[in-house]
Structure formats: C-alpha cells, structure tokens
Amino acid sequence: MKQAEKRHFCEPALACALLKATPDKLIGDLETFGFLFEALVERDLKIYAESFGANLYHYQDYNNKEIDAVVELKDGKWCAFEIKLGANQIDKAATELVALRNDIEKNGGIAPSVLCVICGFSNAAYVRPDGVFVVPITALKN
C-alpha cells in the first residue's frame, strides 16, 4: 500500500462557485459533476466518521487499484467505499471492491468489514448477492 496525502474539499460548493457551475452546466459535464459528487460524499463521510471516533482515508496500492474512501474504526476494522454518481456504475464498482478485498485477503492483509457503493442516482439501499451494500447519498445519516 502506498502512503500519500489526498486533498479533499472542505466544501465542494466552493469549487462550484469558482467554476460558475450551474445545474445545466454540471449535467452537461458529467465528469466534473462526478468529481464534485465524490468530494461531497467524502466530506460527509469524514464528518460522520469523526463523530464516532473513526478516520477517513483513501486507498491505492502499487498496482494502482484504489478505493475512493476508507473509514477506519477505533477497533481497527475498516470499511471500503466506492463513490459513483450514476447507477450504471454500480456493478463495476462492486466488482472492483470484491476483487480488491480478495487480493488483500490472498496477500495476508486484513480485509474490509464492509464493502459499499455510494450512489448519487439510486432509489433505495440494498445488499447485492455478492455482499456489497449499495446506498444512495440521500440515505447517509449520522
């Protein structure tokens, strides 16, 4: 695993203001919208995690496999989150989370306790047959 800092927006709305991003502009530029959505979710996860003594990190290994957000609990257990704007990205994100968990276990590491895809456009939270949770951003609560 690599160690390096990842910068997070404290308030993604600041980037929107600087970019003069309107809803129409963001819908027309889904790549930027996705980056801003990821920053928004990371901000919220950090706030929720810190409220119960956990920490938020990013994961990337030397094969450039990554996890958008890692929440490490006080007891050392950790949860892996992929953050995706569109529901069409859920299957790929879940498959990558499962593969990364399997690689970590195969190499003798401590696997995440929870795998979760947080999605911007999903109607309900559910658990996939592979055990990956899918949670809409609107379901995140402290």
Name the predicted role of every residue range.
Residues M1-K77:
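Accessory nucleic acid-recognition modules appended to NTPase machines
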Residues K25, D29, A93-L100:
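Short, surface-exposed loop/helix-turn segments at secondary-structure junctions
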Residues Y48-S51, V98-A111:
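Arginine/glycine-rich "motif VI" loop of SF2 helicases in the C-terminal RecA-like domain
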Residues Q60, V117-C119:
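Short beta-strand/turn micro-motifs composed of small residues
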Residues G76-K77, I110-V114:
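Short glycine-/polar-rich loops that comprise or flank the Walker A/P-loop
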Residues C79-Q89:
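Active-site ExK catalytic segment of metal-dependent nucleases
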Residues A87-L97, V127:
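Active-site-adjacent loop/helix micro-motif of nuclease/hydrolase catalytic cores
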Residues G120-N142:
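Domain-level recognition of nuclease-like catalytic cores that cleave nucleotide substrates
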